[in-house]
Amino acid sequence: MQPSTLQTLTKKALATQHVSKDDYYILERCGLWWHEAPISMYIDDDNQIIIKTLCYKEGIKLNTALVLAVKENNDDLIMLFTEWGANINYGLLFINNEHTRNLCRKLGAKEELETSEILRFFFETKHKITSSNIILCHELFSNNPFLQNVNMVDLRTIIYWELKDLTTNSMLNEIPFSEMLTKYWYGIAVKYNLKEAIQYFCQEYRHFDEWRLICALSFNNVFDLHEICNTTKVHMSINKMMELACMRDNNFLTIYYCFALGANVNRAMLISVKNFRIENMFFCMDLGANVIEHSKTLADIYGYSIIVNILSLKIYKANPILLSKETNPEKINTLLKNYYSKNMLAYDICCIDNYL
């Protein structure tokens, strides 16, 4: 970190103030100017400096702003952000000419980053879950040759963990590292329903349409699932879609949507039992699944004694309010937002009665 000077502190103070458009020329002369617009800053709840510009209205972390300045070979901003406390070493990930390399050396950068430092920057940058930041992360990391220096096992482990709810996680082993990162950012966008980011990836990577569908089903995003089914040609059977939805417990929204489109709810119950998804199993019975004896036999084969005990009770039946087969995602969300399985409630009451 460079020592603070009066000029540095003045610029920092000015960047936190509201400045009228008539006075923008002052900001430009002070170097608080980027992409033809003023730079402002604030301190977030984690006591981190956040930089805002016309291009990054939601804000980006100071270290992220630095690496973007390095990528653009913007000497003035590299020096400014370093003076404000950015880690100049992170700039090594994006240096693309010798002049910028020498400037970073002059500002205190070492010759190369360790794997732990690269992973730390990766975590810091992706922390902000917004459309603009996920797109930015994709642009920074997905095709970055410097990431070839990272221990692939470490980074792949991180990605597998964050996408652990996906039922096709193993397929990430079979693709190039840059493609895996692209799918990772796309998956995060779908997981958190970041509409602008989803549209960006949809337009840029149309050959990943099936990946988007898998993510929507696995992450219980009924809104994006509805969008996919109504705007693209789906090359997956409805029962396969239901199978993917059932692999993660509490995926009531996407399970219901597949049910409404005609998926076999008995098959869904068997899949839920096989994978020990107890809440999904109860929900399937709410939807009218009645393969209780078959499910009990399957649970016994897999050694799921708790499921065998649950299904031994003769108390389960469909919930009439779920049988209308609604496909409007807003209505589905309203119906199921705070839903508690009617059959699970019946089981709970039975257990309490037996205890008493």
Curated annotation (Swiss-Prot):
Q: Provide the alphabetized UniProt keywords.
A: ANK repeat
The stretches annotated as ANK repeats are 61-93
Can you tell which superkingdom this protein's organism belongs to?
Answer: Viruses
Q: Name one Pfam family in it.
A: ASFV_360
Keyword Signal in record: no
> What is the protein's known function?
Plays a role in virus cell tropism, and may be required for efficient virus replication in macrophages.
The protein's name in its UniProt record: Protein MGF 360-3L
